[in-house]
Amino acid sequence: MADTKYIFVTGGVVSSLGKGIVAASLGKLLQARGFNVALQKFDPYINIDPGTLNPYEHGECYVTEDGHEADLDLGHYERFLNTPTTRANNITTGRIYQNVIRKERKGEYLGKTVQVVPHITDEIKRNVKLLGQKSQYDFVITEIGGTVGDIESLPFLESVRQLKWELGQNCLCVHLTYVPYIAAAGEVKTKPTQHSVKQLQEVGIQPDILVLRTEHELQPDILKKVALFCNVAPDSVVQSVDVPTIYEVPLVLQQQHMDETVLRKVGLQVGPVPEMRQWHEFLEMKHTAQETVTIALVGKYVELQDAYKSIDESLMQAAIYNRKKLNLISVHSEKVTEANVAETLKDMDGIVIAPGFGSRGVEGKLVALKYARENDLPTLGICLGMQCMVIEYARNVLGFKDANTTEIESNIEHKVIDLMDEQKTVTDMGGSMRLGAYDCALRKGSKLAAAYGKEFVRERHRHRFEFNSQYREAFEKAGMQCVGENPETGLVEAVEVPACRWFVGVQFHPEYNSTVVNPNPLFMAFIREAIKTRKKDKE
């Protein structure tokens, strides 16, 4: 295709409506029609990236293949499209201003007064078009974070306005709004949507397609009313009624021919219907699963729904492919004690020890791990979760009672987890960890190698601390095997206890490499083992 088509997804009325899901769903439908699609997210906050943001503030921090800390929506993009993202797929206001200031210091604007318009908006437009110019994408779908009317979104919306003017038919805007249901009146209200569109029009943008989030199905007269008062064609008003799972959203949009509407508006032939066989099979497995596998996720941010989003989704995908429903139980690690651990975990088929940073909640994770190991409960530790496995084993099996990570306590004898050598001179917090995909060689005959079905994998990382190799021999002799390591540095990236049915820890993050059509083998194997445990316990 000669010209890349650019689609912007904006949001109005309230935040958290699911712009990322709508963008990913539309991208999936276009991809299923044979188009090459890229998705990107523009966030209006001034942080360079979300790497230093507390999960309570922003939810999960996602990590791309090339080592960029990104918004969790990139996880949705990858899970829906089954294609990796990069640094170019997530831009923040902070990055935009940083780039402009750097150019100003280099003299690229010499003689000019640097302003929001045109310099900031030009930099935004440059980043929007970057993916389309560097790669052969037919569509670039850009999600604009925030809500129309927010001050911080104005430069992005001005950039969208300019691009719609510059690109003409090759650019369109999808606006997602909320249609509330007033229970007392027994009716839905479209006025918030009308006002949201009016705000968008005030900055010079006429939306081409409206997507209406609603809890109740909207009648044709409501859709016609919205079309009339928002100046949108009737066939360009799409409703997104709440569904049991986000993976049904592409089918909901397809049923209303949203992908066909997009193709017509950008001047392309509609062609055959999208090839969504695998997607339908996935949902069929989900809806027909009868039995349940119960997994405990032990972490310190479990009360926040988005804090471990990729782990939640990876476990759910693995359960579905194993023909089971997932019953995911959130266990706050700060609340786990020796007194209550047995009661807390007794009905679990397996547990996952979540990643994280800092000392809060670590002792609870250690208590949970001791119980799981001694009761042969299938356990998967991720990042800090693996490090906690090492600490627990050092204290309770090797007898190193003061064993710890130097992230928590440096004045100890047994530093079984220590700061990586290359991190010891690092002073900046942001973007300075060991980030992105690295190779890992797996030990032949290990449970981990069996899970992956190969002895060489590449997974993503996000950490500063590592297993202290000085203790490797002691751990091996005591029964904890180092079964994965970086072939270049020798860094231990995975451990397991062969005497247990499944007690595996990995320094990397397998959840960043699991999609709807390609679930991560490690989660698949873990869920299989949990199912076996459930059956054995029943017998």
From Swiss-Prot:
Positions contributing to ATP binding: S16, L17, G18, K19, G20, I21, D73
SUPFAM superfamilies per the UniProt record, alphabetical: Class I glutamine amidotransferase-like, P-loop containing nucleoside triphosphate hydrolases
Start and end residues of each stretch annotated as Amidoligase domain: 1-268
Cleaved signal peptide residues: none
Domain Glutamine amidotransferase type-1 stretches: 294-536
Further information: CTPSs have evolved a hybrid strategy for distinguishing between UTP and CTP. The overlapping regions of the product feedback inhibitory and substrate sites recognize a common feature in both compounds, the triphosphate moiety. To differentiate isosteric substrate and product pyrimidine rings, an additional pocket far from the expected kinase/ligase catalytic site, specifically recognizes the cytosine and ribose portions of the product inhibitor.
Function: Catalyzes the ATP-dependent amination of UTP to CTP with either L-glutamine or ammonia as the source of nitrogen. Regulates intracellular CTP levels through interactions with the four ribonucleotide triphosphates.
Protein name: CTP synthase
Organism per entry: Porphyromonas gingivalis (strain ATCC 33277 / DSM 20709 / CIP 103683 / JCM 12257 / NCTC 11834 / 2561)
